[in-house]
Amino acid sequence: MTMKTITLHPGAVTLADLAAIYWENGTAKLDRSFDAGIEKAAARIAEIAAGNAPVYGINTGFGKLASIKIDAADVATLQRNLILSHCCGVGVPLPENVVRLIMALKLVSLGRGASGVRLELVRLIEAMLEKGVIPVIPEKGSVGASGDLAPLAHMAAVMMGEGEAFYEGAPLPAGEALAKAGLTPVVLAAKEGLALINGTQTSTALALAGLFRAHRAAQAALITGALSTDAAMGSSAPFHPDIHSLRGHKGQIDAGAALRNLLEGSEIRVSHIEGDERVQDPYCIRCQPQVDGACLDLLRQVARTLEIEANAVTDNPLVLSDNSVVSGGNFHAEPVAFAADQTALAICEIGAIAQRRVALLVDPALSYGLPAFLSKKPGLNSGLMIAEVTSAALMSENKQMAHPASVDSTPTSANQEDHVSMACHGARRLLPMTDNLFAILGIEALSAVQGVELRGPLKTSPELQKVIAVLRVVVPSLEEDRYMAPDLKAAAELIASGALVSTISGGILPKLEA
């Protein structure tokens, strides 16, 4: 399969560009109109390196060692030593699509023409993406300030022929992987090592991955929530557009509209409009637009933050428009840390309200006539009893992981870097959190579809019938107790892959861009 290549325009890269790289394992290259700006900044750095004036990152030590002047003859060694000494990551490798996103984001940052690297480095990153030389980057080791030093050092090391890289699915010594791909390691010039590792690209890539996954889950939650509403014979009256317009939150308005459209044409819904003795549904049914809509608004706010950060220069020092080279602090990932914490809250709440809907459906005291645990023969069979327990376990695990990472800080590097963002692990936890959420929503899908089928011969809406058909291809109806783990896995995969979301007609589910 031919990979999609995204042409990046630094300063104007979109979420859609980045999502294509993440979801489709795409490649990326810079628009060639940015070459001149890159070369201009590189020439300025070369000029400084040839002189005697000390400039941080070019001919000085790093961090607490910034006051030590480095001889011109040692500038290349300085950059090589920087990368090797900073390769201190631990843990399992980051997923390949996350690393591809890291590399693309680094291209964007370098492409702004403020980092002072040669075009040779940019072309090597592009070629590595194209040919599938993907650095092995351990998941842990960054505190999210002075950039994501350790993880980005592992990326830079591969460019030098050091460390490890995945090539054709296998981890290889970096030099071997480059050679197999027909690529040559680079010898870093002045400031280039620092430009490669001094940035927020790892934290931002992980936060983007979490955002994309959380938005997919948010869309799926509206589908499973609509199914649960019909399974429980819940009222669609609380989804009336005027209710949500009177409050005014865009996410709530969009979520309410999605639920209405998903339920349109349901025989089940029509069957109990008249003569239903219930006055109001529990909040997990009635307040879906308010909860899922608030989560959608939060994710959209995160999207704006991360789109800005994806286009940012987060290197230090920077070559400014007047050709001066100035030290700053753009490497501090506080905006990304906040965005990751916000995403975690949304993930947690989407799962929390979905889990309560599962609990409602399996409880005959709440489900308005459905059998206990959605089993046709309760007692002899336990039905979805323990599937609901699993959803509760995953919900509580996500609550624990949702504790803000950004409120923590610790001084590092001999107190030179005395306040840090913790953005990297704050963003990294979004991956297991969304895995849990996909599983919760998969369990809701199993429960709700089982419940809808038990309402037969009445049918749900045409849109939701399409969802049921897709689910039943991989998970048959639960007639008797059986080994359940494969069913839960298959349902979660339908959510995670986007297969469930893609069954819904265009324009119904809310997009990430408001």
UniProtKB/Swiss-Prot annotation:
Set out the biological process GO terms recorded for this chain's protein.
L-histidine catabolic process to glutamate and formamide; L-histidine catabolic process to glutamate and formate
Cellular location of this protein? Cytoplasm
Which segments does the entry list as coiled coil? Answer: none
The covalently linked position for 5-imidazolinone (Ala-Gly), per the record, is A145-G147
- Which keywords describe this protein according to UniProt? Cytoplasm, Histidine metabolism, Lyase
Q: Which terms does the record give in the GO molecular function aspect?
A: histidine ammonia-lyase activity
| Any one annotated GO CC term | cytoplasm
Fetch the PROSITE patterns from UniProt. Answer: PAL_HISTIDASE
**Family annotation (Pfam families):** Lyase_aromatic
Q: What is catalysed by this protein? A: L-histidine = trans-urocanate + NH4(+)
| 2,3-didehydroalanine (Ser) modifications at | S146
Modifications made to the protein after synthesis: Contains an active site 4-methylidene-imidazol-5-one (MIO), which is formed autocatalytically by cyclization and dehydration of residues Ala-Ser-Gly.
Q: InterPro entries under this entry?
A: Aromatic_Lyase, Fumarase/histidase_N, HutH, L-Aspartase-like, Phe/His_NH3-lyase_AS
Key word Flavoprotein present in the record?
no
The EC number(s) given in the record are 4.3.1.3
Lineage: superkingdom: Bacteria
Identify the pathway.
Answer: Amino-acid degradation; L-histidine degradation into L-glutamate; N-formimidoyl-L-glutamate from L-histidine: step 1/3
Q: Which family does it belong to?
A: Belongs to the PAL/histidase family.
- Report what the protein is called: Histidine ammonia-lyase
Upper taxonomic classification of the species? Bacteria, Pseudomonadati, Pseudomonadota, Alphaproteobacteria, Hyphomicrobiales
